[in-house]
Regions:
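Core catalytic alpha/beta fold that binds nucleotide/phospho-ligands
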Residues: 1-257
Length: 257
C-alpha cells in the first residue's frame, strides 16, 4: 500500500517588497529570485488550489496555501511515477520544487476534487486519499490508498488550561491536572497531543473535530485495528505535535459520503 507524509516549512520565501501571487509586482535584485521561485511553485498548483491561493490576502497565509497545493502536486507526481512513499519527509519550498523537477514531466495530469457531505476533500481522478493540515509556518500532508486523517499543531503559547476545561472530557482534564502538578511543560505538550489526535480522527471520519472534543478517544485510537502515528517535530525555530490516523474498522469510502 502506497503511503507518504510530508512536513513543509514555508519560511525562507515571503511576499515582502512586492513579491506576491501570480500577477503581482516584480522586485529587483534578490527579490527577482524569490519571484521566479514563487512562479515556479504556482505553476504546480491545480486550477482549484490556484484559485484558493489567489484569494488569500495575508502573506503567511498565501505561503501556506501555496505550500499545500504544491505538496498535493508532489504527492500525485510521486505516486503516478511509481516512486516509493515515505512516511516522514521534511521539506522547504525550494527542496519541494527541486523534487518535482526530478520527476517525469508527464506525471502532471490535472487534479480534480470532490467533497463529502461534511466538506472533506477527495481526489476525484487519483486513487489516493489525503489529509492536509497547517499551523505556524508549516504544512503537513498525509496521503494513502486508504482513508486517512492528519493534524499538525504548533505548540505556541496559549491558554491551554482554559481550552481544555472548556472542551476536553473529564478524564482528560484530570490527566492534565495531574501532569500540571508534576511537570507543567509536559502537561502543555499533552494538551496539544490530545488535540492533534482528536483532529486527526475527525478528519479521518469526515465529521471534523467538534463531535470528538469532549469524547475521550485515546484508548480507542490505540486499538489493534488502528494505525496511529504521532510525535513531536521541530521545523526552524518552531516545535509541533502531529498525528496521523487510519483504521480498517468502519472504513468509509467516497461513495458512502
Amino acid at each position: 500500500m502506497w503511503e507518504a507524509c510530508y512536513f513543509l516549512d514555508v519560511n525562507g520565501l515571503d511576499f515582502s517588497s512586492g513579491d506576491g501571487p501570480r500577477g503581482g509586482n516584480h522586485t529587483e535584485g534578490r527579490g527577482m529570485s524569490k519571484q521566479a521561485t514563487l512562479q515556479e511553485l504556482e505553476a504546480l498548483l491545480d486550477e482549484e488550489r490556484l484559485l484558493k491561493y489567489q484569494r488569500v490576502q495575508a502573506a503567511q497565509g498565501r505561503l501556506l496555501s501555496l505550500g499545500a497545493g504544491a505538496l498535493l502536486r508532489l504527492a500525485v507526481m510521486e505516486f503516478l511515477s511509481g516512486g516509493e512513499g515515505k512516511k516522514a519527509r521534511r521539506l522547504t519550498l525550494k527542496t519541494l520544487l527541486s523534487l518535482t523537477e526530478k520527476l517525469p514531466k508527464g506525471k502532471t495530469e490535472p487534479i480534480r476534487y470532490r467533497y463529502g457531505k461534511q466538506g472533506k476533500p477527495y481526489f476525484e481522478n487519483i486513487p489516493l486519499y489525503f489529509s492536509l493540515s497547517h499551523s505556524g509556518s508549516a504544512v503537513m500532508l498525509a496521503v494513502s490508498e486508504r482513508e486517512i486523517g492528519a493534524d499538525l499543531q504548533e505548540m505556541k503559547k496559549t491558554n491551554w488550561e482554559k481550552l481544555s476545561e472548556r472542551f476536553y472530557a473529564e478524564e482528560e482534564k484530570e490527566r492534565l491536572h495531574r501532569l500540571l502538578e508534576k511537570n507543567p511543560e509536559r502537561a502543555r505538550e499533552e494538551f496539544f497531543r490530545l488535540w492533534c489526535l482528536k483532529e486527526a480522527y475527525g478528519k479521518w471520519s469526515g465529521e471534523g473535530v467538534t463531535p470528538y472534543l469532549a469524547f475521550p478517544l485515546l484508548q480507542d485510537l490505540k486499538s489493534e485495528k488502528n494505525d496511529l502515528r504521532e510525535g513531536r517535530l521541530s521545523l526552524g525555530d518552531q516545535t509541533y505535535r502531529y498525528a496521523v490516523y487510519q483504521s480498517e474498522a468502519a472504513k468509509q469510502s467516497k461513495e458512502q459520503k
